[in-house]
């Protein structure tokens, strides 16, 4: 499945470089077909989302920048939920009994290649020698080959390719986060981020609030309005002073912003529930397996309400208000706080 995504993404890239309208239209059609097998939160039929999502994110960027900015919405959901949540943050997530199950049993492949011992009292990384017990510590921060509904660390599920593709997804979003224009800059994603143009601070999913602090006087700032922001109730305020702001299409345009000015975009952020189709590959064909109800706040998944595994992923425990200062996002200067 990942190979299909890779080839298709290159087709879109070629169409964009050659200005081939027919090829681009065909590429868009393929993208929409492939993404129809992916849940709104980014779970893929092949359950290898770190890789497949990265290619879909890349192709969606081509579409967002050329034909339809609404594709930024899809990118945001995939990165915010699947890519970020596949990170292996703590070795406490490793479950020995599940790791034991995830082995080659007879002729059946279950997660793990190779000839491993009958028990996993000793981790199967014997080439680390005396440091074998330290493997889990060294693995923290990597990314898992994992479905969104579970988060189990078994041998071979934490892979270099998963980590590399996840980091590439983050890089693509960071690269497109703030884009310079002749009059100022555009903001396409709504994360906490900082570069030479501005500092961005997101309060989601706790509060409908997004703040920008320009690094210099800026004639025009355009901020993309996600589908879940109510344009009629969107308010823009600044401290100190005032700014001119109006809605133009799917962007709010802010003019004459001053260096160091805190510009706040305020909007209602309500919970809602969707029902997502979950596909799996059967003889290399995506087949509908089940439906799952998903609770969202904005573009952030708060809970999966159905079909969690025996070892459900530790979804958003790190997003509790106890994990941030005073109910506000932690500011990490010069870095992205996902």
Q: Where does each model-flagged region fall?
A:
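Well-ordered alpha-helical scaffold segments within catalytic/enzyme domains
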Residues: 6-20, 55-68, 212-216
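C-terminal beta-rich recognition modules with glycine/proline-rich loops and embedded aromatic residues
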Residues: 27, 72-84, 88, 92-208, ...
């Amino acid at each position: 499945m990942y190979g299909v995504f890779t080839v298709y993404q290159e087709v879109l890239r070629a169409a964009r470089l050659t200005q081939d309208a027919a090829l681009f239209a065909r590429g868009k059609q393929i993208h929409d077909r492939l993404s129809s097998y992916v849940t709104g939160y980014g779970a893929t039929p092949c359950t290898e989302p770190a890789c497949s999502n990265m290619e879909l994110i890349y192709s969606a960027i081509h579409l967002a920048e050329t034909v339809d900015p609404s594709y930024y919405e899809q990118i945001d959901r995939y990165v915010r939920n699947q890519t970020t949540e596949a990170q292996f943050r703590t070795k406490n997530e490793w479950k020995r009994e599940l790791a034991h199950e995830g082995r080659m049993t007879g002729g059946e492949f279950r997660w793990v290649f190779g000839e491993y011992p009958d028990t996993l009292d000793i981790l199967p990384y014997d080439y680390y020698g005396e440091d074998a017990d330290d493997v889990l510590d060294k693995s923290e921060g990597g990314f898992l080959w994992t479905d969104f509904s579970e988060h189990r660390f078994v041998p071979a599920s934490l892979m270099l390719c998963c980590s590399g593709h996840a980091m590439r997804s983050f890089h693509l979003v960071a690269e497109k986060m703030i884009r310079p224009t002749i009059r100022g800059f555009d903001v396409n994603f709504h994360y906490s981020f900082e570069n030479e143009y501005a500092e961005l601070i997101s309060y989601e999913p706790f509060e409908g609030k997004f703040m920008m602090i320009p690094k210099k006087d800026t004639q025009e700032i355009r901020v993309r309005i996600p589908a879940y922001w109510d344009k009629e109730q969107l308010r823009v305020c600044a401290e100190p002073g005032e700014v001119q702001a109006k809605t133009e299409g799917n962007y709010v345009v802010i003019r004459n912003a001053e260096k160091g000015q805190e510009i706040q975009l305020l909007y209602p952020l309500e919970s809602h529930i969707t029902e997502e189709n979950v596909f799996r590959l059967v003889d290399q064909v995506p087949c509908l397996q089940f439906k799952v109800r998903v609770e969202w706040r904005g573009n952030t998944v708060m809970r999966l309400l159905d079909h969690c595994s025996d070892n459900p992923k530790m979804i958003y425990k790190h997003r509790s208000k106890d994990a941030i200062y005073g109910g506000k996002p932690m500011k990490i200067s010069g870095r992205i706080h996902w």
